[in-house]
C-alpha cells in the first residue's frame, strides 16, 4: 500500500518556518507552489510570498523526464513559438526508485507503460513554461501527448520529441537557439550549474545515456 505522506510532512515543516525543497509529486501542481527548473522559471519563486506558512515555504522540482524536455522546449518557445509536442520516453531503471523494477522484469525487456508518468509529462510543462503573477501561474497553451517506456538502462533517460512550431525555422536557427540558451544559474555562476544547459550533437547516433549522462559533471 502506497501512502502519500510526503505532502503532509512537507506542510508541517513549512508551518514551522522551514524552507522545504521537495522532489515528491504532492504539491507540484498547487497554484502557489513553484515547480522549479531554475534555467527556465526562476521568477516563479515569487509565489513563495503567497504561501501561508508563517515564514516557511515549499518549492518543488518536476518529474525527471519533464525537466529534460522543457529545457529543450524553452528556447523554441522563446524564438519560434510552439503549438504542439509529441514525446516518447525511454526511461532508465533508476527513475523507478527503490526497489524499482525487478531484475526479471527489466533484463532483456522494455516495459511500455509507467503509471502516472504520462500525465506528469503532459501537465507539468504547462505550469513550468507559464507566466507568473502575484499568486499563481498562467499556464502556457500547449498540447502535449506523451508515451512513457521503462528500458533496461541503469541511469539516463532518452526522449524522442516532435514539435509543431508556430513560426517557420531552419535547422540552423533551431540549433543556434539551443546553443545560445542559458539561464539564471549560469548568469550567477552557481557551483553545481552546468556550463551549458543544452548540448547539441551533430553525430546521428548521439545522444546516448551511457556516453553522455555525466557530461558537464552530470
What are these regions (language model features)?
Residues 109-216:
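Contiguous C-terminal substrate-recognition/catalytic subdomains in enzyme active sites
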Residues 1-113, 136-137, 143, 186-190, ...:
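N-terminal Rossmann-like NAD(P) cofactor-binding subdomain of oxidoreductases
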Amino acid at each position: 500500500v502506497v501512502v502519500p505522506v510526503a505532502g503532509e510532512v512537507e506542510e508541517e515543516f513549512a508551518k514551522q518556518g522551514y524552507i522545504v525543497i521537495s522532489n515528491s509529486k504532492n504539491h507540484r501542481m498547487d497554484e502557489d507552489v513553484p515547480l522549479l527548473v531554475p534555467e527556465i522559471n526562476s521568477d516563479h519563486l515569487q509565489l513563495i510570498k503567497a504561501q501561508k506558512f508563517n515564514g516557511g515555504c515549499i518549492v518543488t522540482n518536476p518529474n525527471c523526464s519533464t525537466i529534460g524536455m522543457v529545457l529543450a522546449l524553452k528556447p523554441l518557445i522563446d524564438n519560434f513559438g510552439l503549438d504542439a509536442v509529441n514525446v516518447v520516453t525511454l526511461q532508465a531503471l533508476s527513475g523507478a526508485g527503490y526497489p524499482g523494477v525487478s531484475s526479471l522484469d527489466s533484463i532483456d525487456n522494455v516495459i511500455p507503460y509507467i503509471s502516472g508518468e504520462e500525465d506528469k509529462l503532459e501537465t507539468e510543462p504547462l505550469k513550468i513554461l507559464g507566466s507568473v503573477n502575484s499568486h499563481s501561474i498562467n499556464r502556457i497553451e500547449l498540447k502535449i501527448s506523451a508515451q512513457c517506456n521503462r528500458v533496461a538502462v541503469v541511469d539516463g533517460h532518452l526522449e524522442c520529441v516532435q514539435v509543431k512550431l508556430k513560426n517557420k525555422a531552419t535547422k540552423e536557427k533551431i540549433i543556434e537557439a539551443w546553443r545560445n540558451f542559458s539561464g539564471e544559474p549560469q548568469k550567477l555562476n552557481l557551483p553545481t550549474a552546468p556550463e551549458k544547459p543544452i548540448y547539441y550533437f551533430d553525430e546521428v547516433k548521439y545522444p546516448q545515456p551511457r556516453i553522455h549522462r555525466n557530461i558537464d559533471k552530470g
